[in-house]
């Protein structure tokens, strides 16, 4: 029987202190994931995940491997319990692409943990500018606003829900112009850099050696790429995707539509929170979006 399931994995912003703690206390499979990430990084990140403080967890260099570890812990328990069907495709929102690749057997957990830790460190080091979320404005209008003010569209999250990245002064101009053009709301995001923009080019170049050196296998199901929504299986193409997505827009609307075209009708959001499960039905009405966290108790 052909699968109608997509595994999708969240990105930054889905973290909270205490995530995965109860699960790790009762599940050896979950505990093994957190221990493996601690070992790979050489320090007890799990202590920060489970007990905080929040200001330590929210740091990009901790947040990225923390979300990866928690998501894979959830995944390990669901697979052990037989509660997660095989996928027709996998996808991840930004950071979530690494988690998707681990789950799909393309990338080892330890390698992914080290890469995303370094990715977070580099993003902090090169953290210039910021991001704003724009609600209630057509994408075409917003792209005009971006061109006119010198910012870049970072994330196409859902129809009428998009984020911009750029230098602070340019973002202020973009926010004002977006409101003038009809945006319902513009919200400054609590991030320390202009993610998914050309300002992140030094991050991509510095991370390139790690990504190119990491052993990569063909995933059990194609990864729907954030950059252009193509289904990827070839390890070299996947490496290129992981580098390009640092500076390119996350085209999540196109990713979800491509997954639907690929046969996905049930989207399992594997990780903390339910942000993606809120976005997906707005992109493709009628599909089932299941956040797994509540299923784990």
Regions found by a protein language model. Give the residues of each.
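Non-catalytic positions within long, well-ordered alpha-helices that form the structural scaffold/packing
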Residues: 79, 179, 260-263
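A short, acidic, amphipathic alpha-helical segment used as a generic capping/interface helix at domain edges
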Residues: 247-264
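Charged catalytic carboxylate motif
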Residues: 29, 66, 70, 170, ...
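Structured loop/turn residues at beta-strand edges in well-structured enzyme cores
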Residues: 3, 85, 181, 218-219, ...
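Alpha/beta catalytic cores of group-transfer enzymes, especially the acyltransferase/condensing modules
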Residues: 12-14, 41, 103-249
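FabD-like malonyl-/acyl-CoA
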Residues: 1-141, 154, 185, 189, ...
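Conserved functional loop/turn residues at catalytic and ligand-binding sites
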Residues: 94, 215, 263
């Amino acid at each position: 029987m052909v699968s109608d399931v997509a595994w999708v994995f969240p990105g930054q912003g889905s973290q909270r202190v205490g995530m995965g703690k109860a699960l790790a206390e009762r599940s050896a499979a979950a505990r093994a994931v957190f221990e493996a990430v601690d070992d790979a990084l050489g320090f007890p990140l799990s202590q920060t995940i489970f007990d905080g403080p929040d200001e330590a967890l929210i740091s990009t260099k901790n947040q990225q491997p923390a979300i990866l570890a928690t998501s894979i812990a959830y995944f390990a328990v669901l697979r052990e319990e037989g509660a997660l069907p095989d996928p027709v495709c996998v996808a991840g929102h930004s950071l979530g692409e690494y988690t998707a690749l681990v789950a799909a057997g393309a990338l080892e957990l330890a390698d992914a943990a080290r890469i995303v830790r370094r990715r977070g460190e580099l993003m902090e080091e090169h953290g210039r500018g910021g991001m704003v979320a724009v609600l209630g404005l057509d994408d075409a209008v917003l792209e005009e606003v971006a061109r006119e003010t010198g910012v870049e569209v970072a994330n196409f999250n859902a129809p009428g829900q998009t984020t911009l990245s750029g230098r602070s002064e340019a973002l202020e101009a973009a926010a004002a112009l977006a409101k003038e053009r009809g945006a319902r709301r513009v919200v400054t995001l609590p991030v320390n850099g202009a993610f998914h923009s050309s300002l992140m080019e030094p991050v991509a170049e510095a991370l390139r050696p790690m990504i190119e050196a990491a052993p990569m296998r063909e995933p059990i199901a194609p990864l729907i790429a954030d950059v252009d929504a193509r289904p990827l299986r070839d390890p070299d193409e996947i490496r290129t995707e992981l580098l390009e997505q640092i500076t390119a827009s996350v085209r999540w609307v196109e990713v979800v539509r491509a997954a639907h075209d690929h046969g996905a009708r049930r989207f399992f959001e594997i990780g903390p929170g339910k942000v993606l499960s809120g976005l997906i039905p707005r992109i493709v009405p009628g599909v089932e979006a299941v956040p797994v966290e509540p299923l784990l108790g």
